Amino acid sequence: MKIVVTGAIGHIGSYLIRDLASQFPGSEIVMIDNLMTQRFPSLFNLPTSAKYSFVEGDLTSMELNPIFNGVDTVIHLAAITDAAGSVDNAELVESNNFIGTEKVAIACLENACSLITLSSTSVYG
């Protein structure tokens, strides 16, 4: 099984990439992150029961089809989640959260990948 996790070294992603290895031993896990949160330690001491690769990039500007080719599932976690700061950075939040998600969804359709996407409590205001 080949799984892509966007936002892989964020708060939820850093736990998920480890849990996937135990749930799906032998799987290939492709981690995508823009390193905005600078949680580099999340990449250390990954389980050996899965094969990991890391792609640094911005979902709004990167070409996703080559990465999603042959992927079974994409778990889309990449988002700016700072509700308070989003007012001051509305364009950045819209670009990252809306356009990034749209590009992921289109690439999943074009590559016949299933898509799992999450939200946050921030959607409630």
Located regions from the model:
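Active-site catalytic pocket residues across diverse enzymes, especially alpha/beta-hydrolases
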Residues: 20, 24, 93, 108
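SDR active-site strand-loop-helix element
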Residues: 6, 32, 74-78, 115-121
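N-terminal Rossmann/SDR dinucleotide-binding element
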Residues: 1-73
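Active-site beta-alpha loop architecture of Rossmann-like, nucleotide-cofactor-dependent enzymes
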Residues: 38, 80-84, 122
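NAD(P)H-binding glycine-rich loop region in Rossmannoid oxidoreductase-like domains
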Residues: 59-95, 107
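Conserved Rossmann-fold NAD(P)-dependent oxidoreductase catalytic core, especially the SDR/UDP-sugar
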Residues: 102-125
